[in-house]
């Protein structure tokens, strides 16, 4: 029998101290009497999407050619599905949920005020870099760590100043699945891009010059990655440009693809253009204009016109965490053709040539995580199923594949291949694993031929690795 509050000893409630009951979450009221021109940013409305009714949050309101348009994010759906819609698709008969009023800002404490004054007097290098790039949204001031004013004397937060609501607010994420992002970065700013023979609809915001955002489509050269607002400008540029491949060293070539290595310091403009292009399809990465610390490995397809970019991954020249990939992308028009897997395979081929193990930088995008998990599983299962590989430890697998032991262990646990037998853990090839291997043999997957790799690990001096050398 359940106990009522009066039945509990010492006047205590069931699981809660008296007088400390949690405040119930506010109920969002639906306003049924709203005109279409009264809608503003933050409102949640019902929208027709592919013949179905969806709840969407308005991120932007704009008049385009005399017509009212809304840029919306569909609640509980991936941000890449955000789109600009006409006012006619909004169903006001089901009501509108207004945005919650902004919370009043709390006054800063004495210590916080002093720290804020010091930051204004001595801005860090990173803040100066961010301020100089006007078109590039940076992190909020609260999220930027000022190394010059960082306290390392072991001070801790006073428990009396702990605020439960503030701590919960830090953990919340919005439709972009990122914390403390600028509102402008939530709205996709380009409608379409023309890249070679492909017309592509971007997925996310990228800080291209603001004058380009007013165009219905922009033109991007698939060799130089330069961008133009009009077709005439683009055609004039192409008639004069002679570049027909990424501006780096070709380190790999087979019958299908080539790989080029580009140094971010030596080809700043090209690499910055590559970052702008990739940001249109990556939401989880922060874009900075400092490309000097990175090497870019670009995969291309060849035809009579030249080498066309398929995808790329970047890699830090010196990674303290042992990452072999910083950012990886296959362009949308080439996805689901095995090129993403080939990029991953090439990154591990470089790690093998270096004699190191490596892992991609976290966090990965949703598509990137799926690709890596599939690659890890197929590579490990194929290795274990080979004849003569009767006994292998996790360290042996990591050494052969150039994967970290953490990634190997995670993959073995995911496929239930770790068993406890006679006082020790063993790797067991289950029936499902064997079936997966049989299916894998039937698929014709592209692989990197290490014999065709013409590359030696680059060596950099301490001066070359320094900021802005």
Swiss-Prot record:
Residues bearing the modification N6-acetyllysine: 285
Post-translational modification: Autoacetylation at Lys-285 is required for proper function.
Record CDD domains: NAT_SF
A Pfam match: zf-MYST
All copies of domain MYST-type HAT, residue ranges: 185-457
Basic residues: bias regions: 118-127
One GO location term (cellular component): chromatin
Family named by the database record: Belongs to the MYST (SAS/MOZ) family.
PANTHER family, alphabetized: HISTONE ACETYLTRANSFERASE, HISTONE ACETYLTRANSFERASE ESA1
Protein name in UniProt: Histone acetyltransferase ESA1
Species in which this protein is naturally found: Yarrowia lipolytica (strain CLIB 122 / E 150)
